[in-house]
Amino acid sequence: MQTLSSAPDPAVSVAVTILAVLLALTGFGLWTAFGPKAAKLTDPWDDHDD
């Protein structure tokens, strides 16, 4: 039985790290897409002349 003072399993640490990175990237993407600076973003399809 593990207690709170014992070291966690390395697989759990890796999984938590990967989850944290994915959540950070998702948050950054949402902030970029819908945050205050989103009004300055342009759509390349609209800028392209046919």
UniProtKB/Swiss-Prot annotation:
It is a single-pass membrane protein. The keyword Transferase does not apply. One of its GO terms (cellular component) is plasma membrane-derived thylakoid membrane. Keywords: Membrane, Thylakoid, Transmembrane, Transmembrane helix. One of its GO terms (biological process) is photosynthesis. It is found in: Cellular thylakoid membrane. Belongs to the PsbN family. May play a role in photosystem I and II biogenesis. This is Protein PsbN. It comes from Prochlorococcus marinus subsp. pastoris (strain CCMP1986 / NIES-2087 / MED4).
